């Protein structure tokens, strides 16, 4: 299957993994595989979004995600505008609804949004006439990160069905964890979460995951070890005694990784805190997929933008 022959994506927006069917997910991954091949060519551009306008509206700092969406849009031929919230009317007291109305009046075709409040992207999508992509909303969802993680796993393992995936660390504050739990289980993986009790959401068992507070026990038999960033900017209390203590019990080093399956692969959504969530020799080692995740991010975002383009007028 190529991007041109992929089945039509039945959704006007991409607001989360929740609500996507397994065929929806697999169709996006097939498109992303084609985008990987394109991105590895000398000539990397397509024209599917030529004449279209994409606005990247980020209310939270981002390097990887924003630059990845920008590159994805440009490779598909879009005119891409990055809106700096730090110097925008938002800083002067403008509400999200007013911002949405202002942007809508500019008649963009696609708006990519990251916001610190869960549900904010869904609200904005109801107020505009264009396609909206969720680039992360609070601790709720980060759908393109989960898609790129699935693509990375699939390309290295040949599939996801039956794999044992451990998601480790600050699960409480992680939109990446939530989206990955939903997506990986939809594709047949068995998911377990590992972290201190202070960083695990109450009632997370209802998502069908195994829960471990002992990392060494939790890593046994795992095919994939997915580390999460310790999100200290979202913590207004004492969730961990110290970063040194955190690394001792929940940071991934060689001794802990050895408890997983031989050849288990390591992932991290970035940015990494070396020596806090993961040791440098593991992050840079032969079992690490972290750099590949970055490459897959551009491909997945190209796939998402291209899929949504089918719903644009004359798209």
Curated annotation (Swiss-Prot):
Pfam families: OTCace, OTCace_N
Reaction it catalyzes: carbamoyl phosphate + L-aspartate = N-carbamoyl-L-aspartate + phosphate + H(+)
Molecular function in Gene Ontology: amino acid binding; aspartate carbamoyltransferase activity
SUPFAM superfamilies: Aspartate/ornithine carbamoyltransferase (SSF53671)
Keyword Iron: no
GO cellular component: cytosol
Keyword field: Pyrimidine biosynthesis, Transferase
Associated pathway: Pyrimidine metabolism; UMP biosynthesis via de novo pathway; (S)-dihydroorotate from bicarbonate: step 2/3
Binding residue positions for carbamoyl phosphate: 64-65, 114, 142, 145, 270-271
Superkingdom of the organism of origin: Bacteria
InterPro entries: Asp/Orn_carbamoyltranf_P-bd, Asp/Orn_carbamoylTrfase, Asp/Orn_carbamoylTrfase_sf, Asp_carbamoyltransf, Asp_carbamoyltransf_Asp/Orn-bd
Residues binding L-aspartate, per UniProt: 92, 175, 229
UniProt EC number: 2.1.3.2
Gene3D superfamilies given in the database record: Aspartate/ornithine carbamoyltransferase (3.40.50.1370)
Bilayer-spanning residue ranges: none
Swiss-Prot/TrEMBL GO biological process terms: 'de novo' pyrimidine nucleobase biosynthetic process; 'de novo' UMP biosynthetic process; amino acid metabolic process
Database matches in PROSITE patterns: CARBAMOYLTRANSFERASE
PANTHER family per UniProt: ASPARTATE CARBAMOYLTRANSFERASE, ORNITHINE CARBAMOYLTRANSFERASE, MITOCHONDRIAL
Family: Belongs to the aspartate/ornithine carbamoyltransferase superfamily. ATCase family.
Function of the molecule: Catalyzes the condensation of carbamoyl phosphate and aspartate to form carbamoyl aspartate and inorganic phosphate, the committed step in the de novo pyrimidine nucleotide biosynthesis pathway.
Quaternary structure note: Heterododecamer (2C3:3R2) of six catalytic PyrB chains organized as two trimers (C3), and six regulatory PyrI chains organized as three dimers (R2).
NCBIfam families linked to this entry: asp_carb_tr, PRK00856.1
Protein name: Aspartate carbamoyltransferase catalytic subunit
């Amino acid at each position: 299957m190529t991007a041109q022959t992929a089945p039509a994506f039945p959704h006007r927006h991409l607001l989360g993994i929740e609500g996507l069917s397994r065929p929806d997910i697999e169709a996006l991954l097939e498109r992303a595989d084609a985008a990987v091949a394109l991105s590895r060519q000398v000539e990397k551009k397509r024209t599917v979004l030529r004449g279209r306008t994409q606005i990247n509206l980020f209310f939270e700092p981002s390097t990887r995600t924003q630059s990845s969406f920008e590159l994805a849009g440009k490779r598909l031929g879009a005119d891409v505008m990055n809106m700096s919230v730090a110097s925008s009317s938002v800083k002067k007291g403008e509400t999200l609804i007013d911002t949405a109305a202002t942007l809508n009046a500019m008649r963009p075709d696609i708006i990519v949004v990251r916001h610190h409040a869960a549900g904010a992207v869904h609200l904005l999508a109801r107020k505009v006439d264009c396609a909206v992509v969720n680039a992360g909303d609070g601790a709720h969802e980060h759908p393109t990160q989960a898609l790129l993680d699935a693509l990375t796993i699939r390309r290295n393992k040949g599939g996801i069905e039956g794999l044992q995936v451990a998601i480790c660390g600050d699960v409480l504050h992680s939109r990446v964890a939530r989206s990955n739990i939903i997506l990986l289980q939809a594709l047949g993986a068995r998911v377990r979460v590992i972290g201190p009790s202070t960083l695990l959401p109450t009632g997370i068992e209802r998502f069908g995951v195994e829960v471990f507070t002992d990392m060494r026990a939790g890593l046994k038999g795992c095919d994939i070890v997915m580390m999460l960033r310790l999100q200290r900017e979202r913590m207004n209390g004492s969730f961990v005694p110290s970063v040194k203590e955190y690394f001792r019990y929940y940071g991934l080093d060689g001794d802990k990784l050895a408890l997983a399956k031989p050849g288990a692969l390591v992932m991290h959504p970035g940015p990494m805190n070396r020596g806090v969530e993961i040791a440098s020799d593991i992050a840079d080692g032969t079992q690490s997929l972290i750099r590949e995740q970055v490459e897959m991010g551009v491909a997945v975002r190209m796939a998402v933008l291209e899929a949504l383009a089918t719903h644009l007028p004359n798209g």
